[in-house]
Amino acid sequence: MSADLALLGRQVRHELIALRRTPLTMILSIVFPLLFFVLLAAVVGNETVDSRQGVRLAQFLAPSMASFGVVMATFSFLAAGFAEARSTGALKRQGCTPLPRWALLGGRIGAALLLGLIATLLVIGTGAALYGVQVYARTLPAVLVALVLASVSFSAMGLAIALLLPTPQATIAVTNGIVVPIAFVSDTFTVNGTLPSWMSTLGWLFPLKHLVNLLGEAFNPYLTGNGFQLDHLAAIAAWGVAGALVAAWALRREQDRTSERRHPARSARASDARPRRTTSPSLVALLAGQVLHSVRLLSRNASSVFFAIAFPILLVALIPTVNGGGDQLMADGRTLGAFFAATMAGYGAAVTAYVNLPTGLAEARDDGVLQRIRGTPLPAWTLLTGRVVGAQVVALLTLAGIGVVGGLMYGTPMPAAWPAVLLTLLLATACFAVVGIAVMTVVRSASSMVGVTLGTLLPLCFISDVFVVGVSYPPVLQGLSWFFPLRHATRALTTAAGATGIDGGFSWVHLGVLAAWTLAGTAVVAVRFSSVRLEPKRHRAS
């Protein structure tokens, strides 16, 4: 028994070291729940709700953010890591070693469990130290049991998803596509509001809401008892058992398929040896080819399609709904649905141009693709311009999808000043793309690139009127938000979407700021991209 525990401990340590070397996993599973807690506390205000007992609003916010950290660490990113190991062959190679399969899976689940506990400790510890969150000794055993049970159950479900889906990109898209809507219907992001009855009922079908309520009741100062809620624990355990059964079945199916796989040899055609073109292509043809290539790169990556297109559309459907409905009128006469349609269009453009585009270039650099392209007649400006225009095409597709959803759900009409909306979106996308490429020339690896771009974009979204509106932030945050281009893009888009005439809606000051950032980013790219180290990552000196 002691030898088995030692083996499991070493495997957990191995998985934690691997996670530490993946900045994106660490940021999204540990840092983001804490960041969301801090930002939401600033948004809703940490007011004292009971001066006699010293209860503040953060007392009811911290448990939901801790639950969100657990599900992100144990469901989303355990599934993504397992799918990546399977696709690269690491899982197959580990299966050929004397390492027992239970230790292999147990190491991943144990690492995810510890990651979820760390995320919970950070949120609760920060809440207790800075926001007056009270921790009760009488409910700590119930909290620990709930966290362990939920972590194991979410891990089993994550493994099942990873084994059922064919690629890591599809796994990332599906897991996040599951977590985000369920988080909204599970009261994770709801503090002062009330969900529609159908959404509240739907939330009870999934285990996350049971965990949110378990932790919420354990930290509720007005309840007595030890915090053990057997009905919630049973619901979480039932989902875990179902996930484990599906994972076991999928694992056996995977082993059978691996043993049966054969790749038949293919013969080359004689026509492949003949050149398809006898003249040099025009610059227009080169640029069109790069634009088409950029769009194809996105369409072949399920996770990029989800975060750049599907996720903004999903938020347009969810955020207004949980805030009273998209037909609710704001102070300036605009509907909530129309406002968030404009902000989500800007968010989708930022994800496409500032996160996905430069990350793709960084991956191409690490794989040696950019180095090989440099040895061809393709001009560098054509490559980069094609990527920027491709990002603009994707941003327009996202805008079209948002318009369809807004029209169907809230009756949002097409903006009267649609030329201003299109011009603003195109300029904002170009600005985000150029700034992202400039950042790529400074950051050394693709994995770090994701952490830098996503780690700066999401906090700015909270203080730039993207996810929330009408919140008064401290002067420092206000000034910071107006310094970067995201808030100018958001304000220009919402102004254009709310204009009443076809010839209006142009926010020249905000457009000027976007143009200035674009020019500054272009200057950095012009200086840095030609001298950036393009050799494959494995050939660089450490």
Segments predicted by a language model, with ranges:
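Transmembrane helix segments
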Residues: 31, 38-47, 165-205, 209, ...
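Helix-loop-helix units of permease transmembrane domains in multi-pass membrane transporters
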Residues: 81-113, 360-392
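Transmembrane alpha-helix boundary and packing residues in multipass membrane permease domains
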Residues: 38-42, 124, 128, 159, ...
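Short, membrane-interfacial amphipathic segments enriched in basic
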Residues: 1-12, 198-208, 269-291, 476-486
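Membrane-interfacial helix-loop-helix junctions in multi-pass membrane proteins
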Residues: 51-52, 187-242, 465-521
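Short, highly charged, low-complexity non-transmembrane loops/tails of multi-pass membrane proteins
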Residues: 258-275, 536-542
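Transmembrane helix-boundary elements of multi-pass transport/secretion proteins
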Residues: 4-7, 15-88, 120, 136-139, ...
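Alpha-helical transmembrane segments and their short interhelical loops
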Residues: 101, 106-175, 225-234, 380, ...
